[in-house]
Amino acid sequence: MSRVVKPKVASMEEMAAFHTDAYLQHLHKVSEEGDNDDPETLEYGLGYDCPITEGIYDYAAAVGGATLTAAEQLIEGKTRIAVNWPGGWHHAKKDEASGFCYLNDAVLGILKLREKFDRVLYVDMDLHHGDGVEDAFSFTSKVMTVSLHKFSPGFFPGTGDVSDIGLGKGRYYSINVPLQDGIQDDKYYQICEGVLKEVFTTFNPEAVVLQLGADTIAGDPMCSFNMTPEGIGKCLKYVLQWQLPTLILGGGGYHLPNTARCWTYLTALIVGRTLSSEIPDHEFFTEYGPDYVLEITPSCRPDRNDTQKVQEILQSIKGNLKRVV
């Protein structure tokens, strides 16, 4: 039985579980007053890819509050799967906005889950490296972060090589799977399953947070991966069969109709519904042309992921996981 829960808006105090007071207060100030050429604004990462728009603080607090509400539902045992598609703002740092992310709701959600669950696994399937989440937990062995992403020179955020493995007590608890352009469903699933199988056995998580950005999908303006919602769905199914409390978040996705297709397909999968292939008539129906169907066809781009290189990455990850205490 699925249900919709009205989310709360996160208070400044709740957001300060991760973010600094100074950053939150500055975001609140510029959100209300606009940017008065305050020199601190750029230091806080505001501008460029995180422009100051009126009401952005309230919007961030709403996204953060929804993720916290979802985490609370899991903690209280009211559900086993909770979803917040507007969430997944995985780039924000504790005192800095980054990559369209003004707040790191994923980190807030993980911290909330840790009030009950000792070991939390974070899996990031966005096109971009989940750097903000990895950084937040790079020194702890209580949160393992796994990120599958595009890694190539000049591609944002430029981090997440296979050699980035965490620090101090968190050494070997950060897992990065750097991929190249053109990857399709079958190979992606093979890699994802191969890594997660080892992770599950080694880390034995008590709860999972999944970030499912849709910028990996064919047709995205990023023109990088060549996935379909079915491929992401297969990875999601693999995680859900663990039967653990699972918090599901959105993320990137810059072809809006395809992002809607993807998250609709995944929502149906989560609640066990089969959807008609035809897009129903609604206000934005014309956006779904020329074929007006739920399915997305991969493009004819080559897969740049060399099989031998992929095997080397997987062997390296397996070797690192053997060192997890």
UniProtKB/Swiss-Prot annotation:
It catalyses: N(6)-acetyl-L-lysyl-[histone] + H2O = L-lysyl-[histone] + acetate; N(6)-acetyl-L-lysyl-[protein] + H2O = L-lysyl-[protein] + acetate; N(6)-(2E)-butenoyl-L-lysyl-[protein] + H2O = (2E)-2-butenoate + L-lysyl-[protein]. It is found in: Nucleus; Chromosome; Cytoplasm. Its EC number is 3.5.1.98, 3.5.1.-. Transmembrane segments: none annotated. Its activity is inhibited by trichostatin A (TSA) and butyrate, 2 well known histone deacetylase inhibitors. One of its GO terms (biological process) is heterochromatin formation. One of its GO terms (molecular function) is histone deacetylase activity. SUPFAM superfamilies: Arginase/deacetylase. Keywords: Chromatin regulator, Chromosome, Cytoplasm, Hydrolase, Metal-binding, Nucleus, Repressor, Transcription, Transcription regulation. InterPro entries: HDAC_PDAC, His_deacetylse, His_deacetylse_1, His_deacetylse_dom, His_deacetylse_dom_sf, Ureohydrolase_dom_sf. Substrate binds at residues 49, 99, 254. It holds the Pfam family Hist_deacetyl. One of its GO terms (cellular component) is cytoplasm. Belongs to the histone deacetylase family. HD type 1 subfamily. Histone deacetylase that catalyzes the deacetylation of lysine residues on the N-terminal part of the core histones (H2A, H2B, H3 and H4). Histone deacetylation gives a tag for epigenetic repression and plays an important role in transcriptional regulation, cell cycle progression and developmental events. Histone deacetylases act via the formation of large multiprotein complexes. Also involved in the deacetylation of non-histone proteins. This is Histone deacetylase 8.
